Curated annotation (Swiss-Prot):
Its EC number is 5.4.99.12. NCBIfam families: hisT_truA (TIGR00071). It is an enzyme of class 5 (isomerase). This is tRNA pseudouridine synthase A. Keywords: Isomerase, tRNA processing. One of its GO terms (molecular function) is tRNA pseudouridine(38-40) synthase activity. Belongs to the tRNA pseudouridine synthase TruA family. It catalyses: uridine(38/39/40) in tRNA = pseudouridine(38/39/40) in tRNA. The lineage of its organism: Bacteria, Bacillati, Bacillota, Clostridia, Eubacteriales. Homodimer. The active site is at D52. One of its GO terms (biological process) is tRNA pseudouridine synthesis. The gene is truA. It comes from Acetivibrio thermocellus (strain ATCC 27405 / DSM 1237 / JCM 9322 / NBRC 103400 / NCIMB 10682 / NRRL B-4536 / VPI 7372) (Clostridium thermocellum).
Length: 244
């Protein structure tokens, strides 16, 4: 038996998220089917992040156990010939048997892209969140800085979260603008259900003047979901990297 680790990039537009579901096309199921076609084995592909419907990944990490004799570094080449164009195995390697993509992860980095323009982009409509309002970018930057550190993020999680604790540590946060694209990045030891999208939705309300930047600490301390902004759409969100 061998343990193979994959680093995966995918466009989540046409998938009902990562995790297998009955009667729905998912990223996990699509890759598992490709592995079965390659090795004849029915495997359980473990993903580091269970991304939602429409969310993309630049660096999803997954692993599976196999009895196949295919060298670990050749799985990427073989699987890419079998997978659809919107899923790419960027890297594959054999790892220790105790490696677990989800439970061994020490942190993750996410990116959210906003297309800030009067009119939407036909080419970027599934890869960015279109916002036509003029944004107060400096206020959004100030607001973003308040998320750094260790906090109880109850105000920034959707109902249905199975997490035992809502305390998380954010180690890095940035907000940059290049022409019409606003890029938000955030890294931390873990994220609650929809946490990144709710943070982005809150920053958007700062940008249009509905929430003041200096209100963010109060919203965090309130631990009340209704105090934060709405959940930003899935199409602008990317899983960038998983840390081990």
């Amino acid at each position: 038996m061998r343990n193979v680790k994959l680093i995966i990039e995918y466009d989540g537009t046409n998938y009902h998220g990562w995790q297998k579901q009955k009667n729905a096309k998912t990223v996990q199921d699509t890759i598992e089917r490709a592995i079965k076609g390659l090795t004849g084995e029915k495997v359980d592909l473990i993903g580091a992040s269970r991304t939602d419907f429409g969310v993309h990944a630049l660096g999803q990490v997954a692993n599976f156990i196999t009895n196949s004799g295919i060298p670990g570094d050749r799985f990427s080449y073989a699987l890419n010939r079998m997978l659809p164009d919107d899923i790419v195995i960027k890297e594959s390697q054999e790892v220790d048997m105790d490696f677990h993509a989800r439970y061994k992860a020490k942190g993750k980095r996410y990116r959210y892209l906003i297309y800030n323009s009067q009119f939407p982009s036909a080419l970027l409509r599934h890869r960015t969140y279109h916002v036509s309002h003029k944004l107060d970018f400096e206020s959004m930057q100030r607001a973003a800085s308040y998320f750094l550190g260790t906090h109880d993020f109850s105000a920034f999680r959707s109902s249905g979260s199975s997490a035992k604790t809502s305390v998380r540590t954010i180690t890095d946060v940035s907000l940059e603008r290049e022409d019409k694209i606003v890029k938000f990045e955030i890294a931390g030891d873990g994220f609650l259900y929809n946490m990144v999208r709710i943070i982005v939705g809150t920053l958007m309300e700062v940008g249009i003047g509905k929430i003041r930047a200096d209100e963010i600490p109060q919203i965090i301390e309130s631990r009340k979901r209704k105090r934060a902004g709405r959940t930003a759409p899935a199409e602008g969100l990317y899983l960038v990297e998983v840390y081990y």
